[in-house]
Amino acid sequence: MRYLKRVVLYRIVMVLSVFIIGCDKSSDTSEKPKEDSKEAQIKKSFAKTLDMYPIENLEDFYDKEGYRDGEFKKDDKGTWLIRSEIVKQPKGKVMKTRGMQLYINRNTKTAKGFFVLKEISENNNRVNKDKEEKYEVKMVGNKIIPTEQINDEKIKKEIENFKFFVQYGNFKNFEKYNNGEFSYNPEAPIYSAKYQLHNDDYNVRQLRKRYEISTKEAPKLLLKGGGDLKDSSVGQNDIEFTFVERKGENIYFNDSVEFIPSK
């Protein structure tokens, strides 16, 4: 389901994009973009938002302002929604996901969320509800703890030791990323950048260490952002590392940081 959704959504974005900015056909693909080009603006915008990585202490989000659109009420300080999820589907086997989402409310300075394990049916690409496990969690003192008793010690330990990508990801070398594929839709506004990474990339090594990623294939990095390109605050920032993407075989990691109105 996630595989199909992200393929469809990405294609829609590409079709609606007013600017599809790739490598200049008439020049070397490694040539640096002009300062005023849309490509340069997109990369500069991502550089600003990715500069906040890592945020080791999630409680720092309580004091962090984000991009506010017309949906926010005047007295609402907003809520940060952070998510990290690994998706694995060995060849010929069922797709399984495991990850966590946390709502960090700046008004109440409280954070609650869920740790979720899912299986995706191969027949209809839908979540198998009989195989879905959801555990409520909260954050106290920068630590994630279950709000209910969990008999499975392995799951309990995984929750307590869980780290979001935003806590350890690092993009200090982002300016050196070359040969990106860019798209931009000013109406939304949404924009994206895609890069081919190498296995010696810091973030790739971190993901391999934490999630026992079996393939030796180097991943592609897809960045998706939302909000004003000229605004340095974060509205929506989605990160996807795709190691394997084939019919019946997938390995990818999703992470997102989004600033939303409080409920």
From Swiss-Prot:
Lipidation (N-palmitoyl cysteine): C23
Range of residues in the leader sequence: 1-22
Lipid-conjugated positions (S-diacylglycerol cysteine): C23
Stored PROSITE patterns: PROKAR_LIPOPROTEIN
Principal subcellular localisation of the protein: membrane
Family membership: Belongs to the staphylococcal tandem lipoprotein family.
Protein name, entry field: Uncharacterized lipoprotein SAB0394
Organism: Staphylococcus aureus (strain bovine RF122 / ET3-1)
